[in-house]
Amino acid sequence: MSIWSLWVLDLVGILCTSRIEKIIEEVKKRYEKALSHELSGAELEIIRETIEEVVGLDTKVLIPFVFHGRRLVISPVTRHQDIEQGEREYVEKVVKMLPILVWNSITCIYVPGDSDWTIDLMNEIFKTTSFEGFDPVTLYKRTRGKCGMRFTDVVMRTFRHNIGMLNRFGQRLAQEAGAKIQEISSSLSDEEKRKEEKMLQIIKEYGESLCTKEKQEEIIKAQEIVCDACTYIWRRPEDRASFLIEAYSRYLHSKTVEVSKHGDIDEPLFDYVDHCSLVSTYEKYKSMDIVGELFLRVFLEGKDINDESVNDTVCGVREREEAEKMRGEEERRKKEEESLRNALELLRMEEKEKSKGKGKKKKGGKKGSGEVTAKMEEEKKDSEEVEESAEAEVSLEEMAVGGARSKERSSKKKSRSKGHRYKVHKRVLRWTKSAERIKAELDEGSEEKWRNKSIEEIEEQKKVHDIIEVCVLLRSLDANRFFVSTNRYMKDGTERWKMVGVGIFEEGGEKKVGKVEVGLYRDKGEGSVIYHLMFKAMDTEKAGKGARSSFGKGDDVEGLEEGAGELSDMSGFEYPKGVRSEIVKGGDAFKIVYRNPKDTSEVLRSLTVLQKAEVL
């Protein structure tokens, strides 16, 4: 399913309506806000065609993670007794909503032009169904021996319980779609009648399929695979970190653009995955390594499940398994060599002790001299440890700006706790200049996508690229609390990777949730160089116009060697005279406030980098 289609389906839940003109207007508004330019007539026509053609069926799955503020309170493997006491009441409210959330996941259907009737039908079936005897909260709290249900177990029990309603829903859906085919207005043109009938026929057939055991089992199996995939991801720390950054940014985005239907309760996230493709991939490979990695890619990179994404995943997993096998063999070899070295060293020490014993018999030493020497050595060692401890107390502020050490500290040794070191590429520093100078450099540069941009476009791009103050955070000891590193890849003979954090960009009273992207590569001197730095709004990623996922491998930046001779370590960096920005550091946020240079009391915009979600 295309990224446009996913966005349209997302909007159905937000708008609580399905009039096509209203959806187009909402898409237009969000697209223009995200990309900071007006859509052309051709672009609007593409949107219209996409919305008119798409019919959203059997694509939704529930992601078994629950956030409360900046805390992750439920993971796939969380049991009720594992939940922090202060969060249990909130968690139980979320779990109580599972029946309606699961029902929405199973039956959410987007009908181009008018979905009101399907939404009304969905609500009617749910409200007239008795849930007597099924209480997900009681189920979750129940323990058998010392072990209770995991959150994914409760989710799946709820799915299986709700599947019983699908027969009634499917029958009514097919009946009403059939009736609407007979009622198609004669005032429509032949082409419009054809489109309307085709769409309703698809829905009628889908309703009939929902009554079949095969379709019901497919829905259950798809959600079960997602739950298992999320558990697989959760148990791999390197994957968990990236997954949580993406999930947390989606959670924050949903809070800024949607009004909660359940008051102060934040429901679990949903994603759009083709059920049939997911199930068939699992049936083909029977490997959670492959399916778990595939779902991770789909979730992080916004990809569809198709032959290309499946093949890429299979190759990636096999390469990783081979690398892990080679690494394991190398570690075993090193352990064997180390054991042999230790054995030889022990043998040499024993022989040395024997030779010392023989020497003492021939020549006696001065009484107590050995004890004095040992004491002196111990005092010297303690003195060195105190000196090293003092060295480690270099302040974060000094390290962030590359400042000199305090005079009281030794200048002969380097602090072990010094922050991260990064050089900054010319293409990043370019954005600190005026829009006119940036345009001149881009027009003469080798990057085709940046040529011939208007001054207005450059000024808008400058807002999200001129965030060089983020380097202060990147170089600090706190960087790992805000950013995760992605997998590394090779391009043009250089090793590249990204660091990604969650950010909120504010301007003119509007907030945009997104990610702070940092692109890095390893230079010939084995140093880390920042060649890409920007804030990317979630709406920009959803719009998909030339936008790449923050977690996707690869990029379109070439010719890094062009600016390699003009790298900077950003020590003591200052903006040109007259430009003002202020850094505000808090416990869980790093905020950059940009002010009007002519009137510093006026805030133009701000960027807040948020600490990673806390896992309870």
From Swiss-Prot:
Cite the record's Basic residues compositional bias ranges: 357-366, 410-422
Positions of the region Disordered? 319-422
> Which residue intervals are annotated with compositional bias (Acidic residues) in the record?
384-396
Q: What is this protein called?
A: UPF0329 protein ECU10_1810
Which species does this protein come from? Encephalitozoon cuniculi (strain GB-M1) (Microsporidian parasite)
Short name of one Pfam family: DUF3654
Biased composition regions of type Basic and acidic residues, renumbered to the chain: 319-340, 347-356, 374-383
Q: Which family does it belong to?
A: Belongs to the UPF0329 family.
